[in-house]
Amino acid sequence: MRFSVVTVIILGMLLRFPAAASDILTQKVDQIFSVYDKPGSPGCSLGVIRDGNFVYRKAYGLATLELGVPLSPQSVFYMGSVSKQFTAASLVLAAEQGYLSLDDDVRKYIPELPDYGHVVTLREMIHQTSGFRDFYTLLGLSGHDPADFNSPEETFKIVVRQRGLNNIPGDEWIYSNTNYFLLGIVVKRATKKSLAEFAAENIFTPLGMSHTLFYDDHTVVVASRVAAYDSGPHDSFHVDWSTTFELVGAGGLMSTVDDLLLWDGNFYANRLGKGTLVQELQTPGVLNNGNKISYAMGLDLGNYRGLPIVEHGGALFGYRTELLRFPEQKFSVICLCNIASAVPENLARKVADIYLSDKLQPGASALNPPSNESFPDPATFAGKYLDRRTHLMYSFTASNGNLMAWGAVLIRINANQFYDLGSDVITFEPSKGVIHAKLDLKGETYFSGSRVEELHLGEPVLASYTGQFQSTELGTVYSLSVEKGTLTLRNGGNPPQDLTPIAKDEFDAGDLGRLVFERDSGGRVLGFRVFTQDARGVGFKKED
């Protein structure tokens, strides 16, 4: 067969077009990560998956600054809370094998836990509706640096000392690392194998994930292990990781971009267990009132620019990780970083924006909000808002025409609604001169509070709150005194914390949460309870 010169040229151009289009996409991706692609910088390892194969995989930055070793798709990262989906999978597989039932009372396996007056099931723990207080928060309240607390035994002790729950099991969704820490123990006690052993035999080895493990022994050498860092002054970095951390269940997984390709593929062609694993992992939890939540089994179910997504991120020390899946498009992004300032949830979405541009709906962004001159100035909503039921408090600030919370710009939806990239929708409702704020999370109202103003109390009133207060649940003592007209809290050698009055007998303690004082019938202070986002009602009693 003969081809004319023109035909040959046209065929050549057609053959080159796909490659050229691919080059354009990858150049756009490289631009997203260019901040890390420079000498002497930590960075990220990236995998972009379509139809079960990588369409792009690349690493930016160094795995260890000390040795100058570059990151690669084979670099082994600490995965943080991405671990939870693997712990959940271990529970499902253990149930299939007859070792346990997901509807069992957790005290069947961990009788050291107290009787809370309500049964807590393994299923409620998997879906984060159990009510268990978060152990990282408890460790912080007790005066420890939770990120550097490495002992499973000591962590277990503080968990079983708790005499209360955040909520009636099944009533609310409250994210708590305690759930998955305890589930790791359940696997060990039910199967007689550690979580590391069970997951290796039932997940990692069958899928060929040869560089993935639950790191429960800090003496084990892990080849190609990545160090982690945080940013310092003048473009410097400092070490932000631990060589002795060995808590597993809530975290503890180590893996690579290449191995996670195999895990991602299993969601489309399951090779584990009896065939129902993938369906169970992606089934949303159900509250006692019958409402479904958008948290499944260690996986967040959501929507991004009109497309369903399944995802989970992780963060501990300087490690930041994200697995983002678009199941209908069979498209996923794996983004693993070793610098604390990275936000892989955002980075993964930006990559998806490039590859799925023809399928994603247009959406407002922080840089391109809906324009309407009649919208109230965002500064109208700035301030502190207190939920009187849960004693949660959120602060919103205005900056450069934007409303901000949690250190990020909120994206405007309409006149009174905003959201962040975690899909939390915040609604502000002015009523009778008072502004109310409502935050919807996982399909439920998570926060409902009114804006509060700082109270001004004189020293004689503040003096009534002073003294030594002991918590048997935390094994610690808080000392409260009036210093320069301010009620101040001290706990061991930690920096003092000023307390700000925000309501009757209630003080804001910054990162320590809110202190709500309790009095007897004569008005004498008996003690207080501490309320944080994931540890509510921790008790302190005033010492005589």
Model-derived features: positions:
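Bacterial N-terminal signal peptides
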Residues: 6-16
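Structured C-terminal helix/loop/strand segments within mature extracytoplasmic catalytic/sensor domains
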Residues: 317-361
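Active-site SXXK
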Residues: 33, 46, 52, 76-103, ...
